């Protein structure tokens, strides 16, 4: 398998759950739990990229490498671009972006996302899973993605895509039957050199409208390969309820 590293963007500020990166999960801060899960993958190296010295301190106390970055980044991807430059990562090295609020992420998904990038010889790869719930289709917090025949992303949206026009006209709460509906999973793989290119790209109006950083890549004409996971991954932590759920999982381990 191609060598890759995991970079974990972790900022202290969070609008819905302040300080969540340091939230305790069964005796360890969440960012440490995420890094420990990532270390179970085949990654050659796991590094946390943070904007706060408290996060760097707790990571280092648990033997986890951490690098300081600016607190002015508006996306995790630009934060990782700064981290990759600071770490002097070779341009062709594969980097997997694991979100800092995913303490239950499957190591196998990390490995597979890196593999998809290499197999498809693209600049960026991500993942998705099939969605079967109508309420989730309509939920703007559930990001959907539609693919072309080559399994590359056509578009990501918070809106219901593909839109079941006939069913909606008839007032029916039905999922599209002609194709699978896919929910995006927030994990990315890219070459370290492409991270720098991303940071230099102009901001896409689409990414601003949808608040989805991956749309910058599509808008600038780069394909994004998408792996369809066999099952939905464990949800990340955005709210206190999510945190309570994850804590309960770790209490049973």
UniProtKB/Swiss-Prot annotation:
Protein keywords: Cytoplasm, Lipopolysaccharide biosynthesis, Nucleotidyltransferase, Transferase
GO molecular function annotations of the record: 3-deoxy-manno-octulosonate cytidylyltransferase activity
Xref: SUPFAM superfamilies: Nucleotide-diphospho-sugar transferases
UniProt keyword annotation of Cytoplasm present: yes
Pfam families, per database record: CTP_transf_3 (PF02348)
Enzyme Commission number(s) from the entry: 2.7.7.38
Any Gene Ontology biological process: lipopolysaccharide biosynthetic process
Entry annotated with the keyword Nucleotidyltransferase: yes
Catalytic activity of the protein: 3-deoxy-alpha-D-manno-oct-2-ulosonate + CTP = CMP-3-deoxy-beta-D-manno-octulosonate + diphosphate
Localization annotation: Cytoplasm
Gene Ontology, cellular component aspect: cytosol
Job of this protein: Activates KDO (a required 8-carbon sugar) for incorporation into bacterial lipopolysaccharide in Gram-negative bacteria.
PANTHER family according to UniProt: 3-DEOXY-MANNO-OCTULOSONATE CYTIDYLYLTRANSFERASE, 3-DEOXY-MANNO-OCTULOSONATE CYTIDYLYLTRANSFERASE, MITOCHONDRIAL
UniProt similarity note: Belongs to the KdsB family.
Name under which the protein is recorded: 3-deoxy-manno-octulosonate cytidylyltransferase
Source organism per UniProt: Neisseria meningitidis serogroup A / serotype 4A (strain DSM 15465 / Z2491)
Organism classification: Bacteria, Pseudomonadati, Pseudomonadota, Betaproteobacteria, Neisseriales
